[in-house]
């Protein structure tokens, strides 16, 4: 199902579409949102891409495109649920968003 048909179905059912990008106002909120995605689904590349896309839309995709040197179209494509952004793109986008990736030791499953 496409994003458009999903929104049309939600509207027809009386639901108001929720856009998380409208609620990410500070870098702290953006970082917490990204951390939550990484914590809940660390192997979900599409989810990570979509979360970065949500944050980029909150900041303004035109501004992110300008700061990364990438086109808006390529950012929308890469930062979607179907996207598979390169690591270089992820680093450029996180920098443009004022965020930083960091590593921590994972719990060892036994």
Across the structure, where does each feature detected by a protein language model lie?
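Short alpha-helical DNA-recognition segment
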Residues: 57-77
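Structural motif corresponding to alpha-helix initiation and N-cap regions
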Residues: 17, 84-87
């Amino acid at each position: 199902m496409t994003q458009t048909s999903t929104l049309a179905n939600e509207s027809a059912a009386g639901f108001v579409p929720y856009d998380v990008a409208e609620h990410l106002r500070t870098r702290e909120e953006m970082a917490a949102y990204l951390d939550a995605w990484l914590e809940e689904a660390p192997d979900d590349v599409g989810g990570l891409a979509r979360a970065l896309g949500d944050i980029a839309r909150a900041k303004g995709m035109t501004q992110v495109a300008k700061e990364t040197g990438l086109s808006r179209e390529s950012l929308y494509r890469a930062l979607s649920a179907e996207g598979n952004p390169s690591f270089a793109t992820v680093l450029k986008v996180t920098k443009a968003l004022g965020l930083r990736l960091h590593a921590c030791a994972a719990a060892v499953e036994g």
